[in-house]
């Protein structure tokens, strides 16, 4: 069983390398037309250049997974902001794409919790489609839209989970098919359990990104031993292995909050269930210390008898 690792957005080991520098709309409004254009251009350019630095860092450390920052283009989906963020940076998008393709990196996006398809308010669905389209356009500009995924949560329950799920199935029909083809769903820590998310994924033929921390915070009746094989099966129509999210609680009191690093003892039960399936899968680390937490966790895992480190960020068990 091969386990490959990655992390989210910021490389903590790199100095001044945020790929998510931004500008608020309030600040944006105070600028002249030319100043607005210059500010958007400068901030986006810096985010793209920082992304390139991060990719070089990942390549050097043989880190095969990476989640791009959704804030890579500031105010990209704001209705009052017009900005050709694709055409203005074609060489940089292509440079990012070349690095990703040459080194066979697995890239993803994870829009925020407001990108959802369960609402009874049409404008919420419209905004979700706009946001998904933005993420897809970025992946397309990079040249990896057909091999990368945009991960979201199911959404809210709005007092009636069954009706909300029905709305999801209806509202998702409005998302263009080529974008839906590149989306994944993740179980959340308060509303939609692993079993409920799995059922939706199976009906819509959407790959399921399983989050173990969320699962433990929002348990369902079905045991993980039964759920995980079915979760992995939702990836069978793709040409890539399943991906899971790993983090551990900040504390017992703040169980849903992410800790700085990974608590191996918290994760061990999941790993033992995965080992029984013995299926290759990828792991996205969602701890606060990102790449540093990932590398420390890999080091801890590699010290367990039977687990072999076969590259800087890949283990075999």
Swiss-Prot record:
Coiled coil: none
Glycosyltransferase listed as a keyword: no
Gene Ontology terms, MF aspect: endonuclease activity
This enzyme's EC code(s): 3.-.-.-
Primary enzyme class: hydrolase
This protein's record includes keyword GTP-binding: no
UniProt-listed GO biological process terms: nucleotide-excision repair; pyrimidine dimer repair; response to UV
Keywords tagged on the record: DNA damage, DNA excision, DNA repair, Endonuclease, Hydrolase, Nuclease
Family as reported in the entry's similarity comment: Belongs to the uve1/UvsE family.
Function: Component in a DNA repair pathway. Removal of UV LIGHT damaged nucleotides. Recognizes pyrimidine dimers and cleave a phosphodiester bond immediately 5' to the lesion.
PANTHER family per UniProt: UV-DAMAGE ENDONUCLEASE
Stated name of the protein: UV DNA damage endonuclease
Annotated source species: Bacillus anthracis (strain CDC 684 / NRRL 3495)
Gene name of the record: uvsE
């Amino acid at each position: 069983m091969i386990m490959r690792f990655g992390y989210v957005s910021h490389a903590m080991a790199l100095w001044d390398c945020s790929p998510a520098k931004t500008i608020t709309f309030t600040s944006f409004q105070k600028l002249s037309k030319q100043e607005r254009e210059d500010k958007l251009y400068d901030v986006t350019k810096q985010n793209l250049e920082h992304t390139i630095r991060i990719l070089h860092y990942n390549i050097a450390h043989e880190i095969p997974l990476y989640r791009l920052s959704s804030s890579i283009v500031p105010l990209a989906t704001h209705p009052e902001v017009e900005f050709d963020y694709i055409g203005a940076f074609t060489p940089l998008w292509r440079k990012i794409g070349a690095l990703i393709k040459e080194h066979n990196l697995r890239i993803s996006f994870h829009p925020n919790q407001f990108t959802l398809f369960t609402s009874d308010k049409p404008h919420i669905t419209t905004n979700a489609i706009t946001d998904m389209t933005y993420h897809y356009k970025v992946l397309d500009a990079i040249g990896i839209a057909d091999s990368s995924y945009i991960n979201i949560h199911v959404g809210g329950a709005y007092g009636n989970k069954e009706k909300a799920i029905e709305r999801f199935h209806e509202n998702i029909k409005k998302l263009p098919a080529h974008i839906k083809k590149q989306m994944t769903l993740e179980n959340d820590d308060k509303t939609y359990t692993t079993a409920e998310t799995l059922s939706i994924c199976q009906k819509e033929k959407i790959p399921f990104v399983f989050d173990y921390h969320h699962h433990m915070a929002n348990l369902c009746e079905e045991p993980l031993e039964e759920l995980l094989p079915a979760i992995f099966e939702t990836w069978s129509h793709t040409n890539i292995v399943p991906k899971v999210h790993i983090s551990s609680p900040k504390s017992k009191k703040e169980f849903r909050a992410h800790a700085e690093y990974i608590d191996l003892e918290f994760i061990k039960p999941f790993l033992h269930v995965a080992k029984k399936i013995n299926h290759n899968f990828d792991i996205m680390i969602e701890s606060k210390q990102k790449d540093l937490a990932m590398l420390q966790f890999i080091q801890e895992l590699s010290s367990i008898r039977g687990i072999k480190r076969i590259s800087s960020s890949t283990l075999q068990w």
